[in-house]
Amino acid sequence: MTLKSAQPPLINKEFIMRYLALVGWLLVSLNVMAEEPKIAAKSNEKDLPVPELQSFVTKHKGTFNNKSISYTATVSNMHLLNDKGEVIGDAVTTAYVAESKNDRPVTFVFNGGPGSASIWLHMGILGPKLVSVPSDAQDAGNGPYELINNPYSPLDKTDLVFIDPIGTGFSQLAGKGSAKDVWGLSEDAESVSQIVKLWVSQNKRWNSAKYLAGESFGTTRAAAMMPYLDDRKSPMRINGLMLISQALDYTGSTPAEDNLVAFVTYLPTLAATAWYHHKIEQTSISLEKLMTEVKAFAVDEYLPALFKGSTLNEQQFNHIANKLAYFTGLSVELIKRANLRVTATRHAKLLLADQGLAVGRLDSRYSSDEIDDLALTPRYDAASVAISAAYTAGLNHYLHHDLKVSWQRDYVVSSSEVNKGWVWDRGLEKGKEPKYVNTAPDLALEMRKNPAMKVLLASGYYDYSTPFFDGEYTFARHGIELSRVTQTYYAAGHMMYIHQPSLKKLAADIHQFIESK
């Protein structure tokens, strides 16, 4: 139906002028709004600031492994360049170089994450100072915290260079740099290799023996760096790798429901944790004997049972369930309800559930009081929250007071921005299926190219992040030259050095590793 409009009223001249003015104002406003994204886009194209090169140099003296050592500490930055010679990053290192007439080895140190600064190895075992935290898996409390001399530092045997990859510590993107340049498995390996080579060139240390020491993802990085260090352009050989809490092949350290391998590699860690928390009677079996038994069961009985799956008969199913209940400290009923599959995260939540507690991920000796006792996984990592504030405060105090660093920006201990933005594949071709991260073949290849390179593999029994049995599994199946690998174990977790007896043992093992031929 069509409605007839009424006769329009007469419009006077004043109304027309006001109307035109309003239209003009709207057009101007719309034009400004349309141009704003162009302005924003143009601002995004601007280069990031490029910090000036600075060095903070201090002189010190300390006693390490009963030897008096005079050394220079240098906190300095360097500019990382892309293939065009443009600055993409500003990398900061902390170096300790002893006064010596001899050509000493130099060890390059980094932690993992990805997105973690080198604070843990720096202030936990290798540097000249230690952050003092309780050895018995108790919370470190609130400040002030104690910084103590580290008599176990290997400074008597090797110079040390602590590397904070871009986005961690004081290191940052700069100039033309963006996340895609450095925050990926291959990109990170290349950029950290560039840091190593730059430091060696700037300090005239090309002919020194060289070691890499990495922890957790830092071990992934160390292996991934091999093709970038020992390349055709400027080949550099590494004398040895110190892999602390290794994570080379992620198949065995990814506790997913459909990953049968991880149920096997994690089981000894679950058993060690059950033993530590008295869910397995300690007087009836030692930790070492328990580990021997559980590893044999995991490989000889548990893995075949997982592969058989629903074809297991009732007798076989019940046998495996009873053995798992013993090794994990959980009830037979719960094991059966889980279809013989209890992930590490579920075990961390369930083991001490009768006490309203969950065990820690980085170190399962720790436990936390859970708000929600019915949740499937722990709310947070008891080990991490127990020590992180102490390490952060201790390092910042040390940098600004002892090493005289005057930068006012934050020292980024752990970057969620780096971690969440990480690109894990290594240039995966289109049409190819994704797979677990694995840098073990890089290590195996380099050990063949460099027949004198040696490896130290250090693992903690109570580590739910990188289970120690996965280290054995990884090194046994990738063609790695085991005759040049030293495997050591500690009654602690991921950062085993926060446990005083393990600190002493790992320090001695590192000392012996550097001295060995």
Predicted regions and their residues:
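N-terminal cap/lid subdomain of alpha/beta-hydrolase-fold enzymes
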Residues: E36-S43, G85-D181, A476
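N-terminal cap/lid segment of alpha/beta-hydrolase-fold proteins
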Residues: E52-A95
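Alpha/beta-hydrolase active-site loop
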Residues: L155, V182-V200
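Alpha/beta-hydrolase fold nucleophile elbow
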Residues: R205-S216
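Glycine-rich nucleophile elbow surrounding the catalytic serine of serine-hydrolase chemistry
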Residues: G214-P227
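A catalytic-pocket lid/entrance helix-loop region that shapes and gates access to the active site
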Residues: D230-L312, N318-K323
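C-terminal subdomain of alpha/beta-hydrolase-fold enzymes, centered on the catalytic histidine
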Residues: I244-S245, D249-A262, L330-E515
